[in-house]
Amino acid sequence: MSSLTGFDKEKMINDLHGVIYKIPNVNEPSLEEYVTADEYLSGNIREKLKIAKISTLIDLQYQDHVDALTKAMPQDLSASEIEVRLGATWIDSDIYEQFMFEILSTSGFAKQHIHITYSKFTDTWNVSNKNWDRGNAKAEKTYGTHRANAYRLIEDCLNLKGTKIFDYEYDDDGKKVAILNKKETMIAQQKQDSIKDAFKNWIWKDFDRREHLTQKYNELFNSTRPREYNGDHLEFPNMNTEITLRKHQKDAIAHILYGNNVLLAHVVGAGKTYEMTAACMELKRLGI
């Protein structure tokens, strides 16, 4: 760029302050790589902010990065804006255990043997020793049935399965055959609905749990900001002077020039033909 403009490097960096950003590199602080603001202030903002804050301990020039990223950060969602379903894998198993023990009033002795675990390899939840808490009315009547106690139903809920109850008979060849018991299945699935409703009412009640889960949800799923391309700097030499491109058209052309893979999902009449034609001419002119 210095050879093209005739300006020295430091002048260009100063003149482009806020338009370009030096990418912080904690492992190699001396490495210099610059990107445009629309690229830097997009993607996983929360992760970039962590790196920028660490980089300020080495070089205070990155404080501008911290300020810009803080402004670009998606606004945190509140608990009322987050829908949590029973079985969501981002929720810790100990929280599910706490819910299960509270609604079923599980005895202290049974708590030592009944546990909820999650396997990332099989993507399944497991409730161990489901039959250990025998005689618990809440597990066998309120939230369960005599054919499927609440611990089994909770396990099926966690795995997003509707519980099915089967009876077994032997056919003429002596083979054991499973026959769906529709009545018991319907009752079991109604109990599952009661468990799901209880979970929705329970999950946000405790203040500390609510704060922990909202923070975790925002960190996991609310950190990304889509890139917004800005085509205001594009000049389009030799374009017909009777054609004036609108703001969204210039931005779409910038997206084509820098994005490599673009879908122009505009409505009819938005000017897609001009966008594609102008982008093709610019790509050709720039030798891209």
Model regions: which residues?
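Charged, low-complexity intrinsically disordered regions
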Residues: 2-221, 286
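ASCE P-loop NTPase motor core, strongest for the SF2 helicase catalytic module
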Residues: 219-288
